[in-house]
Design a protein with these regions (language model features):
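Domain-level signal for soluble alpha/beta catalytic cores
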Residues: 1-381
C-alpha cells in the first residue's frame, strides 16, 4: 500500500491534447508550431527518448509511420510525465485517448439507441442516446488504457470513469418509463429514473470495475458531473455509486464539479463506498466569498472521509501562487479540524487551459502543498 505525505497531490482528469498529438493522429506532417511544441516539452518532461521510432517519425514529417495508435501512446506518456514531473502523488494519462465522457461508454453497452446531437453548452454538442431496453455490457472498457498507464506510471495511477447517474441523466429514459405505461406523475418518473441508474450501475459500470480491478486498478475516481443538476436526486447518485462499487476491493472517490454541494446533503453521504469527495472550491473563492466555508458541512454531519480539495480555478488563466495554494490548504484544514483529511487537486480537469498554464498551475499547487506540509510539521515539532 502506498504511503503518502500530509496533503498529497493529484490531478482530476483531462488536460489539453498537444498540437503535435492532434496533427500526428490525423497522419499530418507536423507544422512548425507543433514541432517546436513537441521538442520543447520533450526537453522539459522527457516522455520519449531520442531513439524512439514514433518520435523520430514525427520529427521527420512522417506521422503516418508513427501511426495514430503510436501517437496516442506518446500523448499518454507526455501527460503522465508532465504530471509526474510536476510532483503529483497520483496521476493518470490526462485522458489522452478520450474525446468525451458519455458516448464512448454508452457504445460499450446494449440497450441504448443514439438519436442525435443536442447542445450541452455554448457551441458544444454531444450525441444523445435513449435507453430502449435492458442494459447489458458488451465489453468492459478503459482496460487497455489502464494497462498502458500501469505499465508506464511511476506514481500511483488513479483511473477516472463516468458514473451511472450521469450516464442516465444525459440519456432519454424510454425503456424504464415504458415499463410503467399507464402511470403518471413525478413519483413514477422518479422510480423509473432510479431503475435506470441502478441498471447501468449493476449491469455495466460494476463489471467494468471488476475487470479493471482484476488488472491491478486499485484507485478509481467516479465522475458525476450531473449530480448537481437535480439536487432532489442526490439519493439516486448515492444509490448508483453503491450499486456499482459494493463489495469491490478498491478505493473509490466521487468527483462533482461546480455545484451547490449543500443541496446534495445529507442524501449524498449514503454513498458508503466513497472514501473521498473530490470537489471544486477555488472557483467560488473570492475576496468577498469564502469558497471553503462549505467544508463546515463535513463537521456538521461528522463525515471524516478524505476531501479532494480544489485549489486551482480551471476556468482562469491566472496562475495561483504557491502562497495562495498554501493559504487555501491551511484555511481548509482549520475548518475541517483534521489536516489528514485533505488531498490537494485542481477544481476539475485542466483541459481548457493551455499546457503552459496548466503545467505552471500544477507546479505551484505542489509547491503550495509542500509549504503547507512544512508549516504543519513545524507546529507538530
Amino acid at each position: 500500500m502506498t504511503t503518502f505525505p500530509l496533503f498529497p497531490t493529484q490531478e482530476i482528469g483531462s488536460i489539453a491534447k498537444p498540437r503535435w498529438q492532434l496533427q500526428g493522429q490525423r497522419g499530418e506532417p507536423l507544422d512548425a508550431k507543433a514541432l517546436t511544441e513537441l521538442t520543447s516539452w520533450n526537453d522539459r518532461v522527457h516522455f520519449a527518448p531520442p531513439e524512439d521510432p514514433r518520435l523520430k517519425a514525427l520529427l521527420a514529417g512522417h506521422s503516418r509511420e508513427a501511426g495514430a495508435a503510436g501517437v496516442r501512446d506518446l500523448g499518454a506518456l507526455f501527460a503522465l510525465r508532465l504530471f509526474e514531473t510536476a510532483g503529483l502523488d497520483r496521476v493518470y494519462d490526462g485522458e489522452a485517448r478520450r474525446i468525451e465522457m458519455y458516448e464512448y461508454p454508452i457504445r460499450q453497452m446494449k440497450g441504448f439507441q443514439f438519436l442525435g446531437h443536442v447542445r450541452s453548452f455554448d457551441n458544444k454538442y454531444y450525441l444523445k442516446a435513449a435507453g430502449t431496453g435492458p442494459i447489458e455490457l458488451e465489453r468492459p472498457y478503459h482496460l487497455e488504457e489502464f494497462d498502458f498507464v500501469r505499465a508506464h506510471a511511476k506514481a500511483e495511477p488513479k483511473l477516472p470513469i463516468t458514473g451511472p447517474y450521469t450516464l442516465a441523466d444525459w440519456s432519454y429514459n424510454e425503456y424504464h418509463l415504458g415499463k410503467h405505461s399507464g402511470w403518471k406523475g413525478r413519483a413514477v418518473r422518479r422510480r423509473a429514473q432510479r431503475d435506470f441508474v441502478v441498471d447501468i450501475a449493476r449491469q455495466a459500470i460494476r463489471p467494468t470495475l471488476q475487470a479493471l480491478i482484476a488488472r491491478g486498478c486499485h484507485v478509481v475516481q467516479i465522475d458525476e458531473p450531473a449530480a448537481g443538476t437535480h439536487p432532489d436526486e442526490a439519493d439516486l447518485v448515492a444509490e448508483g455509486f453503491n450499486a456499482a462499487t459494493e463489495g469491490l476491493d478498491a478505493e473509490f472517490s466521487m468527483h462533482i464539479c461546480f455545484s451547490d454541494y449543500r443541496s446534495l446533503f445529507p442524501a449524498l453521504l449514503e454513498a458508503k463506498r466513497c472514501s473521498q469527495w473530490a470537489w471544486e472550491f477555488a472557483n467560488r473563492d473570492t475576496e468577498g466569498r469564502d469558497g471553503y466555508a462549505i467544508l463546515e458541512m463535513f463537521r456538521e454531519y461528522k463525515d471524516t472521509r478524505k476531501i479532494g480539495l480544489g485549489v486551482l480555478d480551471v476556468h482562469r488563466d491566472e496562475v495561483e501562487t504557491p502562497e495562495k495554494v498554501q493559504e487555501r490548504i491551511e484555511r481548509a484544514a482549520k475548518i475541517l479540524g483534521d489536516p489528514g483529511q485533505i488531498w490537494v487537486n485542481p477544481d476539475c480537469g485542466l483541459r481548457t487551459r493551455s499546457l503552459t498554464i496548466a503545467n505552471q498551475k500544477l507546479l505551484n499547487m505542489v509547491e503550495g502543498a509542500r509549504r503547507a506540509r512544512a508549516t504543519f510539521a513545524g507546529r507538530a515539532a
